[in-house]
Amino acid sequence: MDLTFSEEQDELRKVVRSFLAKHSDEAEVRRLAADERGHDPVVWRRMAGQLGLQGLAVPEEYGGSGFGYVDLGIVFEEAGRALLCGPYFATVALAAEALLRCDDEAARTDLLPGITSGETVATLALTEESGRWDEQGIRLTARETADGWQLTGAKTYVPDGHLADLLLVAARTPSGISLFAVAAADAPGLTRTPLPTLDQTRKQTRLEFAGTPARLLGAEGTAWPGLARTLATASVLLAAEQVGGASAALDAAVEYAKLREQYGRPIGSFQGIKHKCADMLMEIESARSAAYGGLWALDAGDEREIAVAAALAQTFCSEAFTRVAGDNIQVHGGIGFTWEHPAHLYLKRAKSCEVLLGTPSYHRELLATRLGI
Amino acid sequence: MELDFGPAVRDFRDELRDWLAAHLVGEFAEHRGVGGPTDGAAWEVRLAWDCELSAGRWLGVGWPQEYGGRGLGLLEEIVFEYEYARANAPYRATVNALDLLGPMLLQMGSEAQKKRFLPPILAVGELWGQGFSEPGAGSDLASVRTRAEREGEEWVVSGQKVWTSFGVHADWLYVLTRTDPQSVRHKGLTLLLLPTDQPGVEIRPIRNLAGQDEFAEVFLSDARTGADMVVGEVGQGWRTAMATLGIERGTTLLPQQLTFEREAESLIDLARERGALDDPMLRRRIVDAWISVRIMRTTNLRTLAELTTGRTPGAQATTAKLYASTRHQQLGYLAMELAGPAGQIVGENYGLDTRQRSFLLSLAETIYGGSSEIQRNIIGEQFLGLPKEPRP
Ligand SMILES: Cc1cc2nc3c(=O)[nH]c(=O)nc-3n(C[C@H](O)[C@H](O)[C@H](O)COP(=O)(O)OP(=O)(O)OC[C@H]3O[C@@H](n4cnc5c(N)ncnc54)[C@H](O)[C@@H]3O)c2cc1C
């Protein structure tokens, strides 16, 4: 039974938290939110160089540190707490995972070291107009020509697609779903259109491909199982991020409830507020169990358990973060409704997380199916 | 759910599994899963089962050997509770003494009290009831009014206690009394051990909403007990009582949650039979019920892992009861809805099936052991550090 954190893991949390306190404070989050690119390359390189965060759970043979998902989950939780802006989720939770899960050793050897060293920003381009995260949602087609494979069609809602050096694109080929790699810089026929987002801390892009040359990863038509597994892993890591965001929102609510006075006493002494905060904590601790359960499952490696735990974590943590972020605004009253106050940043992040990998209803249905309900 | 607690306890686990396989048979096996912390069903069978456990030396696994226990560690206690719940053995009738009074005596009792009271608990020779609540002292336990006065070598106790679980079966009570008549609230309280077999003690059953005479009211009129029956110090009863309530070693939640898991599984079966899974609204609530029990499991495992590695349990330990009790109630409401009109029909003499009983009894889970409102106060004030409400 090892469902607790080691001292090394506590230390990792501390180090990441203090790094992010310096490099992703509110001023920095607001600066990047207002910026169209939303990314600080200097911090990105430090994350890789000083802390090795991009390659934390990548095996050493590809330039990573070979830690587990519990360790990586700690980083995502802290990233969520600090509302970290930039392509960390896209690169690490989606792209690096997709490479690890595809059946192409050469691609891993070629592409992962760039990610772990902090040189490459990468993302996974899967969703299209339908916004669906399942196999049927993938319509974009790839065609084999004399010069190799070419992609034609559009991907949208792609996280950090505007910045990514490396695009991993899920496409339909005659024999099924296949995964392709596109080096975005100067890729012929690629148009990238940044989409203005409700949550300005996480950027999205529309990608149009017109006969864009691409490298097939693994055997043609066999990519879906690896992608499904990637989405399961990413669901758990996103859940950890959601727990972190919710914790920060609760901290803010509690701090304010101790300070703000009405009727001659702190509002936190009123049960209406106190009990709301207690319920927020209960929600968060339950979400933590959901997310950590997923992380432990990932490290244990039982595929059925991973599929179940991932769907559970996304269903529960999405709803929990949104509720807690909304309650935080309620505890703050009018000030919480302003652009000046950070409360809305958490609410908006909560809403974008909620749909990032499919809505809670979608994940609830996945869970039901996986449980045979 | 299969959990492996590691090689160190494997022999212990195997011994227990073998013993359960050999002894949980016949009438005992027929009463699998029967009973609960406030469920008096099949009392005689459960008592006999406790005697069987006692003969096998399975009561007090973690208690010192000198008092009849096995002297094993927390991990073995956890394994015991887990395997016990896994086998779905009847709920122990003696659980109050095993989980609350015993640990309290081990922590705060005198040597003489431990020698006198612990062995009979493990031998199922004496049953105990908790006399804390009073008609005027519920959530606000510090307002107890039952008086105890010293007369020579005895304490003389008068007052009224209420909601004493399994009170009609109790040979002894541990009661919170006011020994300093001038005192208010937490000060001047004393915890006393009091025999029930005497003229000054009258115990009347109270019928609960499930139709069971489970808890009781206790009338004390010049009831007597020895001067040596004080646990902790005179005037320090609040501390002693709080120590009892603080005895939450994470071992009790595990069996409860396995029961909830069984209920969730049976709920899914029922829903399938009724075709309810095709109804999107019901389907959603069913999946959410399953999610709740799974989250309870992970929450408990987090706490157990912290306890067994010597860490201080995290915030989840303070919110676990609130979550489990409220979610279990929701599960009950849903099960009753799925059961439909057939779930509305009871047996003779208000005989309830498992589902009906579990649903009705779940309504107590948000009241006893600190109501949900009190839990939220505790979480808010003691964990989150929010200011207390000013006292009028
Ligand atoms: C099945 C069962 C078994 C029990 N077994 C035992 C036993 O063996 N021994 C024993 O001593 N006691 C026992 N109890 C008693 C139990 O501890 C009390 O019922 C409990 O403490 C609540 O007290 P009360 O019933 O007086 O309700 P009250 O305290 O009067 O509460 C009534 C309502 O008011 C709310 N409330 C009270 N104070 C506050 C506040 N400050 N803020 C917000 N809301 C508040 C409560 O949450 C509740 O909703 C048992 C109870 C039950 C239901």
Language-model features and meaning:
Chain A
Residues 1-83, 102-106, 114, 118, ...:
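Alpha-helical interface subdomain recognition
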Residues 67-68, 134-136, 160-164:
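Short glycine/proline-enriched turns and hinge-like loops at secondary-structure junctions
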Residues 86-106:
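N-terminal glycine-rich flavin-associated loop
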Residues 100-103, 169-172, 181-184, 208-210, ...:
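Short beta-strand-to-turn element immediately C-terminal to the catalytic PLP-Schiff-base lysine
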Residues 118-129:
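A short, Trp-centered hydrophobic/proline-enriched beta-strand micro-motif
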Residues 125, 152-191:
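A short core secondary-structure module
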Residues 134-152:
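Cytochrome P450 C-terminal beta-domain/meander region
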Residues 137-139, 157-158, 184-216:
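Flexible, small-/acidic-enriched active-site or ligand-binding loops
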